[in-house]
Amino acid sequence: MNKSYTIFISFIVALGGFLLGFDSAVISGAVGGITVYFNMSDWELGFSVGCVIFGAMAGNITAGPLSDKFGRKKVLIITAILFTVSATWSALATGYTEFVIARIIGGIGIGGAILIAPIYIAEVAPPKLRGSLVSLNQLNIVIGISVAYFSNYFLKDLEGESWRWMLGVEAIPAFVYFLALFTVPRSPRWLIQRLNLVKVAEKTLIKIGGKDYA
């Protein structure tokens, strides 16, 4: 069994959990800045923070069928793009409406990542490692939340509109996630069930667990 390779691809995919946690928590440090900049009422502030859930619902509902049709890997790549766009647009937003739209886009990424990342890991991980590797995603969510708080702390005293840096810094790990996903194979289970590409799936399974596992 190529344990290191299996852990490697699982860790990359689980970075979606990190972005999920980071995106969920980072807004806490930016609340003061966005309230002043966009001149928000209490209702507008609450909606701008909570609107992510609407995107997450949409992402969660659509990610499953899309991943069944186009593959887990492609949907995860799309979530990475959504995280990158959301972080960048949120940081550059000049109006309340576009800020909310950017936040909802990030929510779609959250809804997709929280569903598809553990599915992918479960489909590539050997039975002996499956439980611990799937839990990587949950661990990364907690790490992402923690990193967001530390990031906000170190960026809060920057001159000018520090909230833009707080929200925009997420684009860096999101783009890294986007690039890293191209190094992971497509789900062997999906390749067989959807495309009947037994030979292609077999190559991945051999790389993960050897010929006996395949």
Where are each of the predicted segments found?
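Transmembrane-helix signature of 12-pass secondary carriers
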Residues: 1-214
